[in-house]
């Protein structure tokens, strides 16, 4: 007899996410992903000055704010054919790399680690043994027995107080939890240390962006960061050196803690290298422009199909016609009018709610396709496209994780296993490791260019009072490819659409009734305890929807069986 699990709400970003699963014989047989809140931000920016849009649309999300801001500015600059000063590109790139580093660290430790780590088990750990386990694996200075003892005592104090605080309401003791006590203790210690590390990443964003979240320094035409090495109120030498100090600290944590912990989780949960396979078509945008027209990048983009790297088709610029012409959104299963696929520049956002229907409309999220196909975006897509493009540093970082995995298990991690729940987490770690090189590279490039006497960070845009101009701003955000599509008519915005990573991945069935990436990734997942569907949460978290969710389980007649809180 089948059961139905409803997880509602799931995510705190891009509105609210509801997941429904049918379970037969202990395995997910069908799934539905539903966005349960209408965003409507596209309607808000219509009839406004295109220079104002970035400040408004970064409020689409309270976590990945910076990405929406930069994508919107790029859309306006694309429409107006603006050549951005290279210093502005360097500053934007540093902000984006630091922001994404922050996002990836928060995802792994604060948002998804507790799907794999049993806090209560850490109470049984031997701190000396925990420290010894990391000998020859990590040189992190806080991996000592003394540090682990301090953390264990903190956990004991929390338990004794009866108030677990941030560790309350977890699935402690769940049969799917497999880490030994010492590894659980290590993970809890790193969880707490990550809180300080992510703060350092945010400091880089705030020092350049003015604040975080919701940076204030962008402008259509560059950035509002005047450079004067001798002036207190500008981007001067002292501030640049201060920023560099945080960049250096980030790299140590990412390499010696985050990367190692990723390999450890994979080593103790090898079955999750076989589960969670989603859409096998992957799409990624090139990122970190090194010229003023977004035509040359540090990271390549691309598209590949059927999980086959040999099908890779490079995407070399943000003006690539192959990329622009392939994107459509349909609303056959979403609560909007105009169900047929639409190109974003002609897209509409007219709500038409008429209730939930498994076979009809069930989401406020549209269904994007790339040349008619469902695709997955995100760090896994990013990693696979860079591997297919032959990017050496990507292969190096992946090989380092594979080597750690092999050292811990004696087994080889195969490429086919990356199309999985843990494959997404590995892809995110590889991305974060590479971002540390980007931070150093772009900081040094900025310093060198300033040393040549180039202090330019902004060019004044010319917005014609008549005529129509279209632009698109692509960006490889922490959760995948983001694009903002702007139409400027007679000096104001006449149409605006944002196709965000969560749209690509959490979209409902598309115009051809093909399931979305979230939905596909859940099918075939075994569920040990329907009252505690931890396995569903693990896979959804692997896409990084930043969630704290209330789980409701119902029986075949629709009656609620249990209500629990999931971290």
Which residues are covered by each model-predicted region?
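Metal/cofactor-centered catalytic core regions of large enzymes
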Residues: 1-567
């Amino acid at each position: 007899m089948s059961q139905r699990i409803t997880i509602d709400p799931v995510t705190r970003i891009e509105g609210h996410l509801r997941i429904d699963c049918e379970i037969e014989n202990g395995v997910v047989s069908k799934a539905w992903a539903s966005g349960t809140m209408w965003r409507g931000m596209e309607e808000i920016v219509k009839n406004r000055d295109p220079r104002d849009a970035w400040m408004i649309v970064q409020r689409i999300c309270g976590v990945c704010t910076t990405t929406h801001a930069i994508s919107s500015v790029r859309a306006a600059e694309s429409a107006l054919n603006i050549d951005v000063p290279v210093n502005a590109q360097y500053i934007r790139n540093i902000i984006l790399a630091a922001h994404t580093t922050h996002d990836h660290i928060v995802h792994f430790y604060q948002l998804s680690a507790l799907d794999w780590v049993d806090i209560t088990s850490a109470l049984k750990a031997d701190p000396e043994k925990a420290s010894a386990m990391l000998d020859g694996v990590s040189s992190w200075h806080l991996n000592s027995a003394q540090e682990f003892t301090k953390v264990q005592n903190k956990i004991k104090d929390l338990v004794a107080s009866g108030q677990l605080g941030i560790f309350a309401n977890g699935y402690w003791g769940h049969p799917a939890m497999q880490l030994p006590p010492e590894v659980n203790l290590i993970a809890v210690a790193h969880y707490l240390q990550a809180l300080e590390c992510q703060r350092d990443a945010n400091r880089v964003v705030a020092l350049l962006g003015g604040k975080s979240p919701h940076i204030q320094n962008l402008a259509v035409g560059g950035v509002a960061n005047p450079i004067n090495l001798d002036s207190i109120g500008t981007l001067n030498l002292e501030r640049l050196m201060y920023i560099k100090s945080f960049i250096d600290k980030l790299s140590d944590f990412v390499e010696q803690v985050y990367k190692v912990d990723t390999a450890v989780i994979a080593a103790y949960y090898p079955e999750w290298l076989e589960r969670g396979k989603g859409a096998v078509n992957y799409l990624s945008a090139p990122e970190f422009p090194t010229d003023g027209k977004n035509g040359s990048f540090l990271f390549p983009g691309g598209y590949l199909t059927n999980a086959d790297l040999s099908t890779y088709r490079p995407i070399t610029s943000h003006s690539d016609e192959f990329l622009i012409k392939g994107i459509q959104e349909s609303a056959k299963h979403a609560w909007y009018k105009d169900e047929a696929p639409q190109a974003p520049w002609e897209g509409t956002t007219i709500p038409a709610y008429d209730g939930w229907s498994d076979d009809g409309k069930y989401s406020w999220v549209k269904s994007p396709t790339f040349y008619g196909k469902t695709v997955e975006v995100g760090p896994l897509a990013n990693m696979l496209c860079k591997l297919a493009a032959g990017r050496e540093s990507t292969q190096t970082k992946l090989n380092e994780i594979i080597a750690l995995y092999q050292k811990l298990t004696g087994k080889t991690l195969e490429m086919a296993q990356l199309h999985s729940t843990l494959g997404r987490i590995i892809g995110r770690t590889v991305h974060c490791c590479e971002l540390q090189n980007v931070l150093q590279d772009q900081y040094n490039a900025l310093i060198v260019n300033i040393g040549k006497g180039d202090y330019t960070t902004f060019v004044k845009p010319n917005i014609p009072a008549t005529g129509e101009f279209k632009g698109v701003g692509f960006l490889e955000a922490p959760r995948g490819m983001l694009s903002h599509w702007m139409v400027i008519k007679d000096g104001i915005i006449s149409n605006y659409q944002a196709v965000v990573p969560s749209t690509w991945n959490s979209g409902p069935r598309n115009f051809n009734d093909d399931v979305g990436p979230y939905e596909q990734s859940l099918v075939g997942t075994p569920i040990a305890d329907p009252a505690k569907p931890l396995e569903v949460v693990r896979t959804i978290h692997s896409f990084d929807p930043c969630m704290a969710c209330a789980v409701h389980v119902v029986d075949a007649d629709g009656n609620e069986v249990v209500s629990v809180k999931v971290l």
